[in-house]
Amino acid sequence: MARRSRGRFIDGILLLDKDTGMSSNFALQRVKRFFNANKAGHTGALDPLATGMLPICLGEATKFSQHLLDADKRYLVTAKLGQRTDTSDSDGEIVQTREVNFTQEQLDTALEHFRGETMQVPSMYSALKHKGQPLYKYAREGIEVPREARPINVFELNFISLEGDELTLDIHCSKGTYIRTITDDLGEMLGCGAHVIMLRRTQVAGYPYDKMVSLKQLEELVTKADAESLSLSEVLDPLLLPMDTAVSGFKEINVSDELATYLMNGNPVQVANLPVDELVRITIGDARQFVGIGQMNDDGQLAPKRLIVLREQQD
C-alpha cells in the first residue's frame, strides 16, 4: 500500500465563514484538504446551526490556537419568542409554548441582568465533557448531569430589533459563554420562553469581519487553480493571516540573532524589560521574525514556552 501524502508544510490562519448545517470539524477537514495542509485545527467549535467566523490554524499556527479559544467573541443572535425547546435552539423539540406579552421596559430590565460578570450553568447540549463524554451525548439519552455554574463576562449586550416574535441581539462576551443559555434564560425572565433560530459569530479577538472566506469561495479558487495550472500557494496562501496574529495582544520581546540561537534550542536567555507572570511574543533580529511565545522563569530569564519550526513553506 502506498504511503499517504502528509500534505504541505503551510503555516497561517484562515478566517473561515462557516455555513449553517455543518459541524466545525467537517469545515476544518474541508479547509485542510483544500490547502493540502499537513496539520490543521480550529479554535473553538460553532454549533451546526451557527454561521460565521471560525479561525482555522494551519501548520505551526496550531501551537497558538488555545489563545484564540480563550479570546473574546461577538455574536449576532435572533431568538424566537414564545417557544422553548429542549436544546434552546431550532434543532431541538418544542417543549413549551407561551404567549409573548412584555413591554420594552421589561425587556430592557431583563437584558441588563445579563450584562457584566455573571455565573452561567452550561447547557446539557454542549461539548463540555463529563467522565470523558460530551454533555450532549448524555442529553440525547435523557440523562441530566449536574453542572457547576461558571463565571462569564458579557461586555456588551445590544438590542438590535424586535419584529413580531423575533428578537435580535448583538452580544460581545468572554470565552465559554453559551448564547443559547442566555437566550433560554432571557425567555424565562420575560415569561414567554425563547430559543435561538439564527446565530452568527461576527468576531473572534480582533480579527476583521471582512477577511472571512467561505468554503464555496475556497472551492472556486481551487477549481481556478486546476483550470489555469496554478499552484495552491498562488491562489490560496494569500488568504492566510500570519500565525502571530493569534498572540498579537502579547507584549513583544525582540531577541538578538545571537541570543536566538540559544533560545531556539530551548534555553532561557537574559533580556531587558521582561514582564512578570505574562506570556510574551518573541521576535528575533532586525526583521522581527516571530518565533513563538515565552515567559519569565524563576531566575528572571526569558524561557521559551512554544516555539515554531523555522522552515521555508513549500507546496
Swiss-Prot record:
What is the protein's given name?
tRNA pseudouridine synthase B
Organism classification, top ranks? Bacteria, Pseudomonadati, Pseudomonadota, Gammaproteobacteria, Alteromonadales
Keywords of the record: Isomerase, tRNA processing
**Record-stated family:** Belongs to the pseudouridine synthase TruB family. Type 1 subfamily.
- Listed HAMAP family: TruB_bact
Query: Which residues act catalytically here?
Result: 47
Q: What GO molecular function annotations does the UniProt record carry, in alphabetical order?
A: RNA binding; tRNA pseudouridine(55) synthase activity
**Stated role:** Responsible for synthesis of pseudouridine from uracil-55 in the psi GC loop of transfer RNAs.
Which NCBIfam families does its entry note?
Answer: TruB (TIGR00431)
Query: What does the record give as the reaction this protein catalyses?
Result: uridine(55) in tRNA = pseudouridine(55) in tRNA
